């Protein structure tokens, strides 16, 4: 007799849910397991926050525009999907960034990594922070390490090692630009544990970075243009990030994909789970995988797991808008010889950052055009649209 067919339900059609469905499909096929895979997505499209809009010769990213190419699991997935040849790197000629100060875009000093200088000469030559701020940052070279390595916020770590000016003018906008969050609320261990490890091992973050980068054969030549984030670690696809999610979907052969299908309740049965879809259909399944982490999850699992419901209820969810602007080259006075710029909170602007998308990756716009992508907090959207000088 054939064993009873099992059913696995995956909730959420973003990159996590899609990848899980694809990997389970592979596993069940390889081991000839009699299991049905159902993937439900509440919206009319797959991909979650990964969304690329293509208009004529324009490639516009509404969500993330890149991924870390240092993650082996991502590259392995691309290889299995046969899209590794479609991966493109950032422009090697402009792997640096700027920080807004007043009305000027100041280059991040060459050889500067997120919160710490590596190359000392360019750092002291930069007008980004005052001479007193630079001296305070150099105290990292002599400050003792912490005796106890309990977690602390990114804000506390930066101020302790490098001072308040370094945080306000450099670390806050650069780290905030990555996570779109307040560094005072971000865990150091959860976001940038490498800096804690550098302090623990080398005492000085600056010395630790220099030794680590040299060991990895990183270029510390002070004439190098590289600064800010390590842009060589970012990559995308020739036709945008949706290449990845569409390629996963195209590989589905035994996945029951259901769009416009919102989970409205989850109930535990004696054997398995009863999942209500759109308040009018019940799916009886053996396993449920929740990949859509949003505020509604807490309500859905309140009865079946009060502990995890309480955990999700404590999570803060931020919202960010991305706005694509297309200009003719002659309209922009700046040379755009970098990947983009970030905006410190102390500048009191309505935007968090701006990416020079058509410089960052090739073939995003027709010849003669420029594509800039601006990041705005949801709370600042009204101010941004109402003010002519929003930028």
Where are these regions (language model features)?
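Mid-domain catalytic core of redox enzymes
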Residues: 259-387
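Short, well-ordered coil/turn residues at beta-beta hairpins
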Residues: 70, 160-161, 291-292
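Short, well-ordered alpha-helices that flank and scaffold nucleotide-derived cofactor binding pockets
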Residues: 22, 26-29, 52, 250, ...
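Conserved Rossmann-like nucleotide-cofactor binding loop
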Residues: 16, 45, 295
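Glycine-rich FAD pyrophosphate-binding loop
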Residues: 25-54
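Dinucleotide-binding Rossmann-like beta1-alpha1 core, especially the glycine-rich loop
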Residues: 56-145
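Beta1/beta-strand and adjacent pyrophosphate-binding region of the FAD-binding site
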Residues: 2-16
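Active-site/ligand-binding neighborhood in enzyme catalytic cores
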Residues: 96, 135-265
């Amino acid at each position: 007799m054939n064993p009873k067919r099992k059913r696995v339900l995956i909730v959420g059609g973003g990159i996590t849910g899609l990848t899980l469905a694809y990997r389970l499909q592979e596993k069940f096929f390889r081991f000839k397991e009699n299991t049905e895979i159902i993937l439900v997505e509440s919206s009319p499209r797959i991909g979650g926050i990964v969304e690329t809009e293509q208009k004529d010769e324009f490639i516009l990213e509404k969500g993330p525009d890149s991924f870390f190419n240092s993650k082996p699991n991502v590259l392995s997935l691309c290889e299995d999907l046969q899209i590794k040849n479609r991966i493109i790197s950032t422009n090697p000629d402009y792997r640096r960034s700027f920080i807004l100060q007043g009305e000027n875009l100041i280059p991040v000093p060459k050889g500067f990594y997120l919160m710490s200088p590596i190359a000392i000469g360019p750092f002291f030559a930069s007008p980004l922070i005052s001479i007193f701020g630079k001296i305070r940052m150099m105290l990292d070279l002599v400050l003792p390490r912490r005796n106890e390595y309990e977690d602390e916020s990114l804000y506390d770590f930066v101020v302790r090692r490098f001072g308040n000016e370094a945080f306000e003018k450099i670390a806050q906008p650069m780290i905030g630009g990555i996570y779109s969050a307040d560094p005072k609320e971000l865990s150091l261990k959860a976001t940038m544990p490498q800096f804690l490890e550098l302090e623990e091992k080398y005492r000085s973050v600056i010395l630790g970075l220099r030794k680590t980068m040299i060991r990895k054969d990183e270029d510390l030549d002070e004439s190098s243009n590289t600064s800010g984030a390590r842009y060589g670690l970012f990559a995308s696809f020739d036709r945008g990030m949706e290449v990845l999610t569409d390629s996963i979907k195209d590989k589905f052969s035994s996945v029951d994909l259901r769009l416009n299908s919102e989970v409205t309740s989850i109930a535990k049965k004696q054997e398995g789970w009863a999942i209500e879809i759109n308040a009018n259909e019940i799916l009886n399944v053996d396993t449920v995988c929740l990949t859509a982490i949003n505020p509604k999850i807490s309500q859905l699992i309140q009865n079946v797991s009060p502990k995890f419901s309480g955990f999700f209820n404590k999570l803060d969810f931020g919202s960010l808008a991305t706005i694509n602007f297309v200009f003719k080259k002659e309209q922009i006075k700046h040379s755009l010889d970098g990947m983009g710029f970030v905006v410190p909170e102390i500048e009191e602007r309505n935007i968090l950052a701006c990416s020079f998308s058509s410089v960052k990756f090739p073939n995003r716009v027709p010849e003669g055009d420029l594509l800039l992508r601006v990041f705005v907090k949801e709370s600042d959207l009204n101010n941004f649209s109402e003010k002519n000088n929003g930028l």
